[in-house]
Amino acid sequence: MMGPKANAAAAGDLPEYAEVDPTGRYGRYNDVLGKGASKTVYRAFDEYQGMEVAWNQVKLHDFLQSPEDLERLYCEIHLLKTLKHRNIMKFYTSWVDVSRRNINFITEMFTSGTLRQYRQKHMRVNIWAVKHWCRQILSGLLYLHSHDPPIIHRDLKCDNIFVNGNQGEVKIGDLGLAAILRKSHAVHCVGTPEFMAPEVYEEEYNELVDIYSFGMCVLEMVTFEYPYSECTHPVQIYKKVISGTKPEALYKVKDPMVRQFVEKCLATASRRLSARELLKDPFLQVDDLVFCPGDGDYSLMNYLRQPYLEHAYSNVSMMSNGLSESIDEDTPTEDRWDCEDDDIKADGIDLFNGHEDEPLGNVDITIKGRKSEDGSIFLRLRIADNDGHVRNIYFPFDIEADTALSVATEMVAELDITDHEVTRIAEMIDGEVSALVPDWRPGPGIEESQDTTYCHNCGSNVSSCGSLYAYMSSAARGCQCAELHGRFEEITFQANGEQTDLQDSGGSSDDGGGQTQHVKDQEAVHSNGFVQMGRRGPRDQFCFSSFQEQSCSPRHYEYDTSLQAKGFDMKHEVKMAKYKARKMAHLRRAIHPSLDFDNLNGERRMKSSLNKLQSFHIGKNHNFRIPTCERSPGARDAEEDPDIFNLAYHSRHPDPGAQRARHCEVDAQSSPDLMFTARSYYTGAQLPTNLPRTKSVTLNAVDA
């Protein structure tokens, strides 16, 4: 048992309070938790509750000009301790220190810090977490603005929003500068310039200035940039805000829905929505969506487990991995609505695209559109990674028949794009089309897509990628929407590599004076009878085989050197292919060149040995046609042989996870001429009137 002397000694070792409130309940230490221009936050202790609190001290300086102002301000901040809301920082008490000209108020203390610090600490945040924070902040603002008279914060920013990290809660804090709006408008210019609405500078504003500041907070959350960080002086910020110029960070937001939501918050005062209206905004509506069961109110949605996309993905995988003997074979697939933690990590819609172990922004996706004179829309989707690999995807968009979601789903299925990019690409398409066509109304989202009508003739289990076999079958003879499938034209190249001369490479001779080119460093990929032989040499070599695995002999690849004497020009090959693509896109009913069948609209028959089956591909330095397959003896009728249709399907619908092997690894770098051709196609540059006939290196299959 400790005696009085021991207690006194122990008390002497304890740090002394630097200051005590008038009631003696709260004691302030000298430990500084945070410091701003006019406010310092200290660690303090509540002796009655036995818990640590935050002691906020604000320097008044020139805020108070008379005793009347002091009395008014004291009454206003005294009222703040009556605020009780789960998204408002608890305000225990406050008082004015007249002698030191300070305002002191005691609030709850957060160990996770401010939202800005928390956001910078956790870089990998899902879009649903951001929405969760937005709903909580707006809920707190709605509570403040619903008072009579309304309470406005006047200094809302991420530095004044605090996080309870173990529960994912955010609370609005730093209400020491808030004011009770006793009149119709406030008449004091107070706040942080980067977050102040234009009307604040005019000293004529209402509670909607908090909505403007909230929009800047959302912008900072998704870009990690302070608004108007491009400005070096407050005067520059003032000029931009007054003129209506938005911060440059806004134009770095690639998600059109996020950008549109921020723009609603930054609109002029007459058009700016209230907190109640923003809570009803579609961007924040999550009640109608399907969530994984979890402990919190807001769980991460697993888009790929919805039936609409589950069937589309499973059918492409089924036909690509060879798990079925026939394309039209039914495979039972449950409509899974449950979610696993691993699925959430793998399939969740990530605001910042990439895996956990990859750097932020590993893949950059941009979209750009062009509207022709006849009203048709052409879009280009550009996918680039940090390694310099660039994929340019060109496709038409029919504003009368297409929706962004259907086109994005079709693109993902056909071009082997990461599946969880479906909604991201759809939102980008909606945003670009809206910019080109002002009266365009975005199509239904994923949560609405199940009620939309879909073609079951060309779509296998409502998959937007469709089925070639179903299209070619007699059951789909009257189908029209299948003509849209295969609309995508893709060019893959290395962005920053060593330049090569196309004409020189096209005219180079083979070793041995035109003898058979031997394959070296071959890499074979077998997938349902499709065998691709890649090599690290001046040429790429391909061959088709039947669904039974066959060995491809190097003798199968023999180049016809007679074309070299005719001055084979690769640029004409590219131009011709792009001209064909533009022509078909202009008609809005383009069929991909790799599926060019004779008399498709009539008898839909295929010639023997698939002479018309072609595939245009930009390899290392050459363009060529894929050699025809030797028809199997047992296949007498191509129209009745499902393997042939499977083969045709795989030429257009690659297996997810094997796109690089299927499109040929590009080790050599692209020519500037090739990139210019791609750019010319997009910008609508005029092509020469007299184009030479397309030439291709003939690969004659020779029996071993």
From Swiss-Prot:
SMART domains: S_TKc. One of its GO terms (biological process) is intracellular signal transduction. PANTHER family: SERINE/THREONINE-PROTEIN KINASE WNK WITH NO LYSINE -RELATED (PTHR13902). ATP binds at residues 107-110, 157. The keyword Glycosyltransferase does not apply. The gene is WNK1. Belongs to the protein kinase superfamily. Ser/Thr protein kinase family. WNK subfamily. This is Probable serine/threonine-protein kinase WNK1. It is an enzyme of class 2 (transferase). The active site is at 174 (proton acceptor). It comes from the Eukaryota. PROSITE patterns: PROTEIN_KINASE_DOM, PROTEIN_KINASE_ST. It catalyses: L-seryl-[protein] + ATP = O-phospho-L-seryl-[protein] + ADP + H(+); L-threonyl-[protein] + ATP = O-phospho-L-threonyl-[protein] + ADP + H(+). Keywords: ATP-binding, Kinase, Nucleotide-binding, Serine/threonine-protein kinase, Transferase. Residues 27-284 form the Protein kinase domain. Its EC number is 2.7.11.1. The keyword Kinase applies. One of its GO terms (molecular function) is protein serine kinase activity. GO terms for cellular component: cytoplasm. Residues 499-521 are annotated as: Disordered.
